[in-house]
Amino acid sequence: MRTVTTLFAAACLLAGLSGEYAFAQPAKPKTLQLKDLPASVQKTVQETLKGGAIKSIAKEKEDGIEQYEIESTLNGNSRDFNVAADGRLLVVEEATTLEAIPAAAKAAIQRKVAGGTVTTVETFAKPGKPLLYETAYKDAQGKRHEVLVDADGKDVKD
C-alpha cells in the first residue's frame, strides 16, 4: 500500500511540474490567414503585396500598437511589412544588396561592419519618411548586430 501511495504522490508531483512548465513557456504567435484580418487590413495587405506571395501573417503588439506582420516574397526577394489594426501601413522592409544602395549609405555600412560579415541588407520604408537602409551583420566574434542608416550614411534610430 505504501508503494502505491508513493507512486501516486510522485505521479501527482510530476503532473503538477509539467503543467507549471507548460504554462511558463512564452506563447507562440498564431499564424493567420488573409481572410482572418479586418477588411481595412486586408485591403492594405493586397495593395502592398504588389503581386507578391504571402509566406506568413502574425498578429503582434509593438511599441504599444496592435499590428499584423506580413512576411512575403516579391520576384523571389523577401518583402515584409507591418499593418496597424486600423489598416495603416506602418513599415515595409525589402531585401536588397549593398551594391544597390546609395554610395554614402554603402560606405557607412562597410565602415561599421569592418571585419564582420553582412548577413542581410534591406530597405526600410515608413510612409512619409525618407528611405532607410538596414543591415544585419556578424562581427569577428560571431555576435549579431544591426545598423540603420539614411541615404547620406548617417546613423538613424528607429
Please provide the spans of the model-predicted regions.
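Long, terminal "pre-/pro-" and other extracytoplasmic accessory regions
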Residues: 2-8, 12, 16-158
